[in-house]
Amino acid sequence: MTTAHILGFPRIGAQRELKFALERYWRDGASADAERALVDTGRALRAEHWRIERDAGLDCVTVGDFAWYDHVLTTLAHVGGLPRRFGFDARALTLADYFAAARGNAAQPAMEMTKWFDTNYHYLVPEYSPATTFGPGVEWLFDEVREARALGYRAKAALVGPLTLLWLGKARDGLVERLALLPRLVPAYRALLARLREAGVDWVQIEEPIFSLDLPDAWRDAARPTYEALAPGAPKLLVATYFDDASEHAALLKALPVAGLHIDLVRADAQLDAFVADYPADKVLSCGIVDGRNVWRNDLDRSLARLAPVRDALGERLWVATSCSLLHVPVDLAHEPRLDEELKTWLAFAAQKTREVAALRDALVKGRAAVAAEFDDAAAAAAARRTSARIHNPLVKRRVAALTDADARRASAYSVRAAAQRARFGLPLLPTTTIGSFPQTPEIRRARAAFKQGVLDHLGYLEAMREQVRIAIDKQLAYGLDVLVHGEAERNDMVEYFGELLWGFAITSNGWVQSYGSRCVKPPLVYGDVYLPEPMTVGWASYAQSLSAKPVKGMLTGPVTMLQWSFVRDDQPRATTALQIALALRQETLDLEKAGIGMIQIDEPALREGLPLKARERAAYLDWAVRAFGIAASGVADDTQIHTHMCYSEFGDILPSIAALDADVISIETTRSNMELLDAFETFDYPNEIGPGVYDIHSPRVPDADEIERLILLALERIPAQRLWVNPDCGLKTREWRQVDAALAAMVDAAKRVRQKVEEEAPA
């Protein structure tokens, strides 16, 4: 019979139980009582998630999708591969050890974090050296198998695959090629798989998403010998790809000695034909047709029509699944009592998606009539969504259609604008500023909570936030900063804040997803055409500007970042939605300019994150991303200065696109790289002004003026003084005022010192 399964379920719990248990554990110093409470929370969450999967009608539950912090770190713990610098005993690894690797300890910094492929989830980056070894590790996966079996469930285990585990890591200490470690890693996997078989596990989902990438030949060539070594003595192996098209590797994957393959039909529907053609008779094909990365309800009839020919070709060897793990979506729509009822009918969170998978299985096996009520309801919701006036705004569509190339370009070249801006603002050499946000203090959080709970009225809330703006301006004047910001006290999140004010966005009450560890985010929903009904930031910026003669920057989140950090409608191209957001932001920039705000910062920290996994698709993405920024930024006069901020670890491959944004000033995160990131800008001969970060805001450590002066001098080796700004790496919302006070005072002092040196050395 056709099998229904999911690749994984969210870990955090419907009420973020894991988040709060982790934070209690860390706060209580990892005491024995705190550890027992954390372990109990994890066990209860797993049992609840398996119950949801069973009640939905899935044929098996997934174990191994749970992780205390991150599934890549947990996989390393299973195969004894945590970084050697921590000195942990792999077989006796404790939770405290595990969290030390994730968060650092007194002796060692934390492992690096980066984005999981093109998602907004962060994984901990494995560290590989010539001395890296693998072997038996923790028992956690086997504990989960025993828990599931004790509850009467048929368990399918999930593991990150060995090739992906190596690919995701970084080579250190002279290691030339990560693949050189494969002969050491494969035996550890083989032993782990053999033990799973002994534990009664029939199937292991072994995840190799790197087969959705443009893989070098050496990595492709490693696949067959790896799985020839793993298959004997293992349970049945289901090799899972997801996030993009794996069809260029279809022949290779179909030839692997495994029991099945999984492909993502949401991100890459066209690859199905390449896999079904000549599909081996000894393999199942798991079709990921329910979206694991977005929140929209499945069009069950459309999915059934897509799967029916596959069922006819493969029979019971067709499996129905989510496209990827449900880690990336909220847990349960039932916990959204305040969300608009019509909008709710268009949505499916993790709990609902498990049922969609099972319903499709039932229709394939028993016929649509067996699940007619569910299918009819889904069809009605899809029809309503297609025609809803709430989604389709003719005015917005006309405005997008009327856009021209000129709308995405400033009226004058940078050199002309720079002269106009120098005349308007009269800033000193090496002007000092910050990136935007200041500490979100307990007072701010209490006022926001009281306002949301109805305890504090609107006027009371406005006055509380205005007081925070006054504090921020007074402090910046005391530091001696040249360009000020209002501090963003009123913003709970740089995307959600705007989502609450733009038409076409909706905000959930409990739509949390895990970003990393205990960090959760609540992405807005972009459900319809985006429109700006009234100014969003003008009041705050104008009030701040009224408190000082120095320029105050208006602060906006850019269109691509708004898109990347939201759940975006799937009924039109993302590029179209980006242009709609850009038009709304364009109106906001014009409103700010009209109110006398002469500097406007449009942040795009997610521009690089949006790059498609396939190289052939990146140029098209960068074209519309740059155009969207241009639409947002280009309506203003020459003497209005546009800033942007980006925080990446590498810029080289997208520098032409960054230059094409044509922002007057770009600030970037460079402190940890010791200004080496500026090398790419120097080589490229970046033409506009740059503010390389000189203060690492991600650390509680406060730099002194000498340290910051050294960094400014390093920056001057690469960037002319006339185009150099001085600023922190990023926003300061996560820091404490005592840290900010000391660091920014030191930054201004350092800038003044270097300014004096440059002016003294300038030819008379």
Swiss-Prot record:
Catalysis performed (reactions): 5-methyltetrahydropteroyltri-L-glutamate + L-homocysteine = tetrahydropteroyltri-L-glutamate + L-methionine
UniProt-recorded Gene Ontology molecular function terms: 5-methyltetrahydropteroyltriglutamate-homocysteine S-methyltransferase activity; zinc ion binding
EC number(s) recorded for this UniProt protein: 2.1.1.14
Keyword Ligase attributed: no
Cofactor: Zn(2+)
Active-site residues annotated for this sequence: H698
Residues involved in L-homocysteine binding: I435, G436, S437, E488, D603
Gene3D superfamilies: 3.20.20.210
GO biological process, one term: methionine biosynthetic process
Keywords attached to this entry: Amino-acid biosynthesis, Metal-binding, Methionine biosynthesis, Methyltransferase, Repeat, Transferase, Zinc
Pathway(s) the chain acts in: Amino-acid biosynthesis; L-methionine biosynthesis via de novo pathway; L-methionine from L-homocysteine (MetE route): step 1/1
Name used for this protein in its record: 5-methyltetrahydropteroyltriglutamate--homocysteine methyltransferase
Upper taxonomic lineage: Bacteria, Pseudomonadati, Pseudomonadota, Betaproteobacteria, Burkholderiales
